[in-house]
Amino acid sequence: MAKKVTGYLKLQVPAGAANPSPPIGPALGQRGLNIMEFCKAFNAQTQKIEKNTPIPVVITIYADRSFTFEMKTPPMSFFLKQAAKVQSGSKTPGRDSAGKVTKAQVREIAEKKMKDLNCDTVEAAMKMVEGSARSMGLEVAG
């Protein structure tokens, strides 16, 4: 018989840097989960990923206080900032440009994010990436 799910918890944790300090410790602790068990398992799974890459995680919490977690791909803004080689987006998107990304870079990001996006084609995913780029104040060049 399947375990009874009591809830889900969404966190964004830097790769290889999960530790019991806030925000991870309190979020897991108040739900009665073993914090160190999560930290060790997460850090083991993110060994091959570049350090401090933000990884969204969905933790499924069961009635017996056990858990499983699923890692997603890093946020689109992370990939866009890397591609444009900027630290942050524009403070006034639409007026000031923070940088540029090419269509090839947009396609590459769309292909990486495809499994986490709610679209069927790469072209639809590219439109989502372009929209995110524009909202960050990045220009999409030819």
Swiss-Prot record:
The entry's keywords: Methylation, Ribonucleoprotein, Ribosomal protein, RNA-binding, rRNA-binding
Glycoprotein as UniProt keyword: no
PROSITE patterns: RIBOSOMAL_L11 (PS00359)
Alphabetized InterPro entries for the sequence: Ribosomal_uL11 (IPR000911), Ribosomal_uL11_bac-typ (IPR006519), Ribosomal_uL11_C (IPR020783), Ribosomal_uL11_C_sf (IPR036769), Ribosomal_uL11_CS (IPR020785), Ribosomal_uL11_N (IPR020784), Ribosomal_uL11_N_sf (IPR036796)
Superkingdom in the source lineage: Bacteria
Posttranslational mods: One or more lysine residues are methylated.
Pfam families hit by this protein: Ribosomal_L11 (PF00298), Ribosomal_L11_N (PF03946)
Keyword rRNA-binding attributed: yes
CDD domains in alphabetical order: Ribosomal_L11
GO terms classed as biological process: translation
Example of a GO cellular component annotation carried by this entry: cytosolic large ribosomal subunit
GO MF annotations in UniProt: large ribosomal subunit rRNA binding; structural constituent of ribosome
Subunit structure: Part of the ribosomal stalk of the 50S ribosomal subunit. Interacts with L10 and the large rRNA to form the base of the stalk. L10 forms an elongated spine to which L12 dimers bind in a sequential fashion forming a multimeric L10(L12)X complex.
Main function: Forms part of the ribosomal stalk which helps the ribosome interact with GTP-bound translation factors.
Family: Belongs to the universal ribosomal protein uL11 family.
Designated name of the protein: Large ribosomal subunit protein uL11
Native source species: Afipia carboxidovorans (strain ATCC 49405 / DSM 1227 / KCTC 32145 / OM5) (Oligotropha carboxidovorans)
